[in-house]
Amino acid sequence: MREVISIHIGQAGIQVGNACWELYCLEHGIQPDGQMPSDKTIGGGDDAFNTFFSETGAGKHVPRCVFLDLEPTVIDEVRTGTYRQLFHPEQLISGKEDAANNFARGHYTIGKEIVDLCLDRIRKLADNCTGLQGFLVFNAVGGGTGSGLGSLLLERLSVDYGKKSKLGFTVYPSPQVSTAVVEPYNSVLSTHSLLEHTDVSVMLDNEAVYDICRRSLDIERPTYTNLNRLIAQVISSLTASLRFDGALNVDVTEFQTNLVPYPRIHFMLSSYSPVISAEKAYHEQLSVAEITNSAFEPASMMAKCDPRHGKYMACCLMYRGDVVPKDVNAAVATIKTKRTIQFVDWCPTGFKCGINYQPPTVVPGGDLAKVQRAVCMISNSTAIAEVFSRLDHKFDLMYAKRAFVHWYVGEGMEEGEFSEAREDLAALEKDYEEVGAESAEADGEDEGEEY
């Protein structure tokens, strides 16, 4: 089997994780107590969903995941929630003391006390796999735990499981909506390690997802549950080909191969279509061409950045439901003729498509309508640099006055780490600039430079 272990870190990671496992269970017909009436091979078997669930002799299906947090309140919600019987108690690891929105606490003082326990649990899960494919890591980089403990854990995973791929689903701070004053510090420090220790990182931001909920689902005041259920649909579409047998299957490592032209340029934009409420869906039939176009709309992007300001390097389209390759090819051909969607000149084809015949599932009583077909797009665009330049700008404003820095230094960090991380991001912005530059003109100029 090609198993995948999911790691959910900090409040955002755990709450997105809850939404994901809720959706996976519905998709596979697994009950909240882990029993799966439709499963004929009790106690093992080589079913496709075993990539995400392990089976006990008693026929119980246990998610291959760990939930980590430095304080107990969020994990306690899992311990008492609907799916409390689904998880093994050892998979839910919580500390007693919060990271207090401080990267240094999550990474140095409090984080390092808990990280060995986490790695121990992950080792147990890994030993339970026959052919571990990689890790999905869910965290946010604005807070203290997601950024600090998240990057610490990624660094340690690189040491222990060097060759395994690591996909990150990372919630970045939004341009307008902020939950902490020190978000820019935490994000810059954390991205510094995401750069080195993840293979693909899908960027999400709450504001963009809020806007999608408000605009497309007519929810006036979206809650985190609304946001997370939408994010869960994206993640479910990405992992569908690992969990179901499909026509055009896509492996975790395949994302890497097709989306990452240079190791550092691995921050992805994602979008999902159709995001549509039940009332509207009743009156519309959405064709493959329509949902494909809508996935490329700037308003559908799950991070606040405008793909029209950049160029696409590569793009992965994961269809599910009633979709045939002929429709996909036609839709992609149409996209290629659009002037607004520009590719870099050194990557002319740029599309990777996957199809999975399992139609999208929706959470009963949720906001999304049940549809026949859906598409999820993950794209590598130079426009994502906007997100970094926004963060860097906010970082610079605070760091120029050394505001709040003493909280980090007091937890054993050195001031040099701030400037090191900031320089790394400056280099990243420059990398994106160069990648998007026209290669034909560039050839003449840089003959003098040595590589």
Swiss-Prot record:
First-level EC class: hydrolase
Modified residues (N6-acetyllysine): K40
Co-factor(s): Mg(2+)
Any one Gene Ontology molecular-function term assigned to this protein's record: structural constituent of cytoskeleton
Domain of life of the source: Eukaryota
Subunit structure: Dimer of alpha and beta chains. A typical microtubule is a hollow water-filled tube with an outer diameter of 25 nm and an inner diameter of 15 nM. Alpha-beta heterodimers associate head-to-tail to form protofilaments running lengthwise along the microtubule wall with the beta-tubulin subunit facing the microtubule plus end conferring a structural polarity. Microtubules usually have 13 protofilaments but different protofilament numbers can be found in some organisms and specialized cells.
Binding of Mg(2+), residues: E71
Reaction it catalyzes: GTP + H2O = GDP + phosphate + H(+)
Keyword Cytoplasm recorded: yes
Keywords: Acetylation, Cytoplasm, Cytoskeleton, GTP-binding, Hydrolase, Magnesium, Metal-binding, Microtubule, Nucleotide-binding
A GO biological process held by the record: microtubule-based process
Similarity remark: Belongs to the tubulin family.
Cellular component GO terms held in the UniProt record: cytoplasm; microtubule
Marked site: Involved in polymerization: Y451
Role this protein plays: Tubulin is the major constituent of microtubules, a cylinder consisting of laterally associated linear protofilaments composed of alpha- and beta-tubulin heterodimers. Microtubules grow by the addition of GTP-tubulin dimers to the microtubule end, where a stabilizing cap forms. Below the cap, tubulin dimers are in GDP-bound state, owing to GTPase activity of alpha-tubulin.
Catalytic machinery residues: E254
Regions that span the bilayer: none
Protein's name in the database: Tubulin alpha chain
Binding-site positions, GTP: Q11, E71, G144, T145, T179, N206, N228
Pfam family, one: Tubulin_C
Enzyme Commission numbers on file: 3.6.5.-
Phylogenetic lineage: Eukaryota, Viridiplantae, Chlorophyta, core chlorophytes, Trebouxiophyceae
